[in-house]
Every structure is written in structure tokens, then in C-alpha cells.
Amino acid sequence: MSNKKNDRRTQILQALAQMLESSPGARITTAALAKQVGVSEAALYRHFPSKAKMFEGLIEFIEESLFTRINRIVQEESNVIARIEMIVTLVLGFAEQNPGMCRLLTADALAGETERLRVRITQVFDRIETQLKQVIREADLKQGLRPAMGVAPCANFLIAIIEGKIRHYVRSEFKVKPMEIWPEQWTVLAQNLMLNR
């Protein structure tokens, strides 16, 4: 019984993510979601007490997907510049592979929803920025490199790039992919991001 319930929850979340992708700018209603899943609205509410909880389920998926991999990068990669590249590339790649989630990451799909959801999205980016700050600080300790503009401004600059590329992806209705010209951009950025002591 529990597996069937989890399968239905997963099916609901996948349908919600697909609707976010296929209907840029549109508000998702529980009636439309129920129709997409092929169940009644009451059936949706048996699995999630509110639409906000459905969005939270997607945000939890984003957090788990990103932070599990970010932690692995930090543990396994010793080169700081490579770590930074891998973290930024991970987030951009995740965004490109999950266009519907980008509407959550930009809070585009959260207009009119509870403030708690926007706070959760802000926290996702804050956590990524904190992780980048930690990696940048380690550059000095482990490799004798210092950021060209200070730790906090450097991490903030990287987050601005991530958010800007995701927002551009949403604004283009998923035509301009975040990874499309990222390798060339990273080459220029990496040359100017850190300085030798």
C-alpha cells in the first residue's frame, strides 16, 4: 500500500513538473493537475494536503538532487577551480535537464502562492552561495589562490551568473539553454576569477 501511495505521489510531482515546463507563465490549478494525472482533485489531496505541499515536494527534489552531488564534488575534487566549475556546471546542467523546475527556481510559478515557498527557493540559492564561499576560502589555504574580488563578492558573482542563466532559460521559454555557451564563458571566467598569492 505504501509503495502505491509513493508511486502516486511521484506521479503527481512528475505531472506538476511537466505542466510547469509545458505551460510557461501559466498558473497551475489543482483541477488541471488532477486532469493531467487522471485522478480527481480529492485524490490529489489524499496525497498532498495542499498545492503548496506539492511545490514543496518538487523543491525537496531540487535540494536533494543538487546538494547530494555538490557534497560529493567537494569531497572528491581537490582542485578548487575545478570544484567551482563543477558546482556551477552541475546547477546549470540540472536546470537544463529539468525546465519545469526552473520555473520554481526563478519563483515564476510561485506567484500567488504562499511566501514559505519563495523563502525555500531563496534558501536553495543561499546554500549554493555558502558552499561556493567555502570552496573559494579553501583556494587560499590549499592552493595559494585568492579571489580577484574577495570571497563574498566572488561567490555572489557566481550565483548571479547561475540565476541569470536560469532566468534567461525561463524567459526564452526553454529555448536558450543554460549550458549552450557555458564552456566558452567558463574559460574566460576561470582565467580572471582567482589570483596567485
UniProtKB/Swiss-Prot annotation:
<keyword id="KW-0131">Cell cycle</keyword>
<dbReference type="Pfam" id="PF00440">
    <property type="entry name" value="TetR_N"/>
</dbReference>
<dbReference type="Pfam" id="PF22276">
    <property type="entry name" value="SlmA-like_C"/>
</dbReference>
<protein>
    <recommendedName>
        <fullName>Nucleoid occlusion factor SlmA</fullName>
    </recommendedName>
</protein>
<dbReference type="GO" id="GO:0043565">
    <property type="term" value="F:sequence-specific DNA binding"/>
</dbReference>
<dbReference type="InterPro" id="IPR050624">
    <property type="entry name" value="HTH-type_Tx_Regulator"/>
</dbReference>
<comment type="function">
    <text>Required for nucleoid occlusion (NO) phenomenon, which prevents Z-ring formation and cell division over the nucleoid. Acts as a DNA-associated cell division inhibitor that binds simultaneously chromosomal DNA and FtsZ, and disrupts the assembly of FtsZ polymers. SlmA-DNA-binding sequences (SBS) are dispersed on non-Ter regions of the chromosome, preventing FtsZ polymerization at these regions.</text>
</comment>
<keyword id="KW-0132">Cell division</keyword>
<feature type="domain" description="HTH tetR-type">
    <location>
        <begin position="6"/>
        <end position="66"/>
    </location>
</feature>
<dbReference type="InterPro" id="IPR023769">
    <property type="entry name" value="NO_SlmA"/>
</dbReference>
<dbReference type="InterPro" id="IPR009057">
    <property type="entry name" value="Homeodomain-like_sf"/>
</dbReference>
<dbReference type="GO" id="GO:0051301">
    <property type="term" value="P:cell division"/>
</dbReference>
<dbReference type="GO" id="GO:0043590">
    <property type="term" value="C:bacterial nucleoid"/>
</dbReference>
<comment type="similarity">
    <text>Belongs to the nucleoid occlusion factor SlmA family.</text>
</comment>
<keyword id="KW-0238">DNA-binding</keyword>
<feature type="DNA-binding region" description="H-T-H motif">
    <location>
        <begin position="29"/>
        <end position="48"/>
    </location>
</feature>
<dbReference type="GO" id="GO:0005737">
    <property type="term" value="C:cytoplasm"/>
</dbReference>
<comment type="subunit">
    <text>Homodimer. Interacts with FtsZ.</text>
</comment>
<dbReference type="InterPro" id="IPR036271">
    <property type="entry name" value="Tet_transcr_reg_TetR-rel_C_sf"/>
</dbReference>
<dbReference type="InterPro" id="IPR001647">
    <property type="entry name" value="HTH_TetR"/>
</dbReference>
<dbReference type="InterPro" id="IPR054580">
    <property type="entry name" value="SlmA-like_C"/>
</dbReference>
<dbReference type="GO" id="GO:0010974">
    <property type="term" value="P:negative regulation of division septum assembly"/>
</dbReference>
<keyword id="KW-0963">Cytoplasm</keyword>
